[in-house]
Amino acid sequence: MHPKKPDPSSIQSLSAGRRSFIAGLTGSLGVLAVQPAWAQFRVEVSGVGLTQLPIAIAGFRGDAQSPQKIAAIVQADLERSGQFRAVDTAGQNLDENSRPDLSVWRQRAADSLLTGSVTRLADGRFDVRCRLWDVVRGQDLGGQSYVIPQGDLRLSAHRIADFVYEKLTGEKGIFSTRIAYVTKVGPRYNLWVADSDGEGAQSALTSPEPIISPAWSPTGAQLAYVSFESRKPVIYAHDVASGKRRLLANFRGSNSAPAWAPNGNQLVATLSRDGGSQLYAIPATGGEARRLTQSASIDTEPAFSPDGKYVYFVSDRGGSPQIYRMGAGGGNVERVTFTGSYNISPALSPDGRWLAYISRIGGAFKLHLMDLGKGTAISITDTSADESPSFAPNSRLIVYATQQQGREALLTTTLDGKIKARLTGAAGDIREPDWGPFQR
């Protein structure tokens, strides 16, 4: 039986991930401002990976006098990646200037050691330094130093974690990247930009009407989103640096589910301007939309392949929501998902190897991961209301929304599902995450 197409007005009563799909079927804005209530995130890491690098992160000299505990932030970042296991340092503080006795750390089964210092300068800024040691080979792997204002202390810790991650794994770290997400507290919705661990949240938009589908531009300079402040879905682009926004799509009917092309020149979105919900290409500068799909069904939730050659999307053309792909210019449509009767919310890994999506199994909505080379997929969560998956820019982690203990929260997971970190705020529900790109 062909599924009934819901009324777009029902969007307000739906949870985030399904909300995006249903929107396809159918405030005030200012410069980013830090909001302390939502900066108080709690990160809880659980699970044990099959292979983890043991690292000792000594307390940084002067860390006790710093408003931010640099060593603790670095350790939390590395543990959240799923690739590192912290070795007990017994409260030792070691700075970057002297060579440590590495035999002590070998006895503690550490493969590497991070030391450092935090110094407050006379002008109020901070000098943050670190040094990384290969305990097994007895080698100095180099260090980093930053002279920064107090407000950038957390960023310096994330950059140190990036440095350690890249030195020890050979891949870029993602800890200094940003995520966007939406919160609902009482009747108000907020769009936020935050550090990758959810801290340092800054408000981009607040509205009494729903905000959905935030999508980072390839450079991280802009954030597209859908706002219902005009009592219908309208797509805007928010400039992260200036806080200004501009209209991208306000055609007749619904305008939803924006997705940036990898070159940043255009977006693909779902419009109902000609009746049914179809995919259209829209110039990044705004302007006339070009229709890409020509079906009598519902086509929505577009996502570009990282090489820009394909657009993955959700369609009910086969009788139930499934994931398809087509050429970036339209045409040559082929089905991607065949297991399960309800598959939505496609997200492509930046390395092009993986497709994350939400599959309904019985009455549960679960995050699945497909190996695009093999066409095989597995469920990687034990929750039952998963939504809105988005890959980290190094393709090693996925952030998604789910429901736990009666609230919507954000989780990150490794691709094997072994290590998860739960990000919860002080109040309200957190939904619609999108992980930003590497900073350029």
Model-derived features with residue positions:
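Structural motif
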Residues: 187-192, 232-236, 276-280, 320-324, ...
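Short beta-strand->alpha-helix linker/helix-N-cap micro-motif
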Residues: 44-104, 114, 118
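Amphipathic beta-strand/beta-sheet edge segments enriched in Tyr/Trp
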Residues: 98-163
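N-terminal secretory signal peptides
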Residues: 1-16, 23-34
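Multi-bladed beta-propeller domains
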Residues: 195-212, 238-256, 282-300, 326-342, ...
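Residue-level detector of Asp-centered blade-edge/turn motifs that repeat once per structural unit
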Residues: 218-219, 262-263, 306-307, 350-351, ...
